[in-house]
Amino acid sequence: MHPFNKSLLPKKVILSGADCFHLVLDKHAQKHGAGGNVMRKLFYFNKPLSAETIEAILKRSPVIYWLCNIRLREGLLFQKPCWEFIDKGNEIIVRQHQCAAENEVPREILGRDISIRSERFIEADLVHYPSGACAFIVSWNHILLDAKGTTLLFEHLNAVSENKEQDHALLFPGPEKKTNIITYIRNMYKVKHFVQQSAKPPVYSVGEKKKKSEEGLTAEKIIAFSSEETKIIIANARKAGSRFGPTLYLIACCSQIIDRLRRLKKRSGDLWIPVPYDGRLKGANGPLISNTVSFLFYRIPAQELTSVPATVKYLGAQMMEQIKLGIPQRYTMFLNMMRHVPLWLYYFLVSKTGKGVFASYLYTSTGDNFNNLRSLFGEPIRDISMIPALTFPPGLTFVFLKHDDQLSVNIAYSPDSV
């Protein structure tokens, strides 16, 4: 007997435009031997947790149950792809591991893929360390959840553990507004022109090889800052001219590093970085399921990389211009239109635009989404980390995460690139 009414779960959820873009990234990963489009969130605790208790809480979640009982129905021409709820009775399983190295993630977990053909689209692991501490790890296919969606997921799980009532309407995407074909076509030409100009060659990418030499291998590195160091970083961002939070400053710092790598390899080309932009309305608490991100596109020539403040200023001008032109909203409309295109043609068009170059490197940030998440399942969280999906090429992703007023940089990379 389930503690929720299964009849309330949606029988069908149409993929958003951003979801379909992640389908393209799945195809990109398969082509280049880069592993899957899997995200992992790690929660560290100072004491051992009970796998049975965690599993019992997860089994009370309608969202977790839905994620364990869906299949992808790919759209044909003029049909949108969707998730179908097929209710096979699958329930989530919490796997347990013993790890000799403190805070490390077993390769067994990192090597598991969650493909679009998997039985379950979310997995859970509990890793025990010699000190008595543990890590709870959730892995999911990125097609289903974006950064804000994962925040909402863990808030939802806390509500489940506390037996709080929840609004099911906030868990899944609601009905879409219809857009007429003329509006789609006009918008498509504007977006196509903008992106082609923004991404035109020459663009330098850290991923120069066509295929990874060791199939599926992803390396990880986490750089953690104390709360005092985080305050200094935020103060430095303001001094450098990053007016709307530290994002532009952090992108500028990453870009400086990549430009040094470019010069070290004696390569030419500008940097081109598509940066996720949350498409939810400000203060919105849903939907949990589905990607609602759009993008801002930054191109940085070498002459604008002479200093961090110079790069911040150049990025700021591009950001303001794109927001003024409504590029994030236009790109969302473009992605929504592309859902009607068969996947093979979609991939061909996307890869042709940048001549196979998806980006110089990839950057994303969870902002303050996890900063105030201090407990999970009623237990205090010591630290939160994240292992992003690796898109190859470029084969280098920076994820900035803030928890308990402490910033960390979570880096996923291919040894073939870096």
Model-derived features: where do they sit?
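Non-catalytic N-terminal regions of enzymes
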Residues: 1-185, 234-236, 240, 245-271, ...
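Non-catalytic regulatory/linker segments of enzymes
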Residues: 6-7, 45, 221-223, 228-232, ...
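A short small-residue
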Residues: 37-39, 228-236, 294-298
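Charged, glycine/proline-rich intrinsically disordered loops and linkers
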Residues: 179-209, 335-349, 354
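Flexible, P/S/T/G-rich "lid" or insertion loops adjacent to the active sites of thioester-utilizing
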Residues: 185-242
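Short proline/glycine-enriched turn/loop segments at secondary-structure junctions
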Residues: 263-264, 284, 350-354, 387-388
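Acidic/histidine-rich catalytic neighborhood
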Residues: 273-302
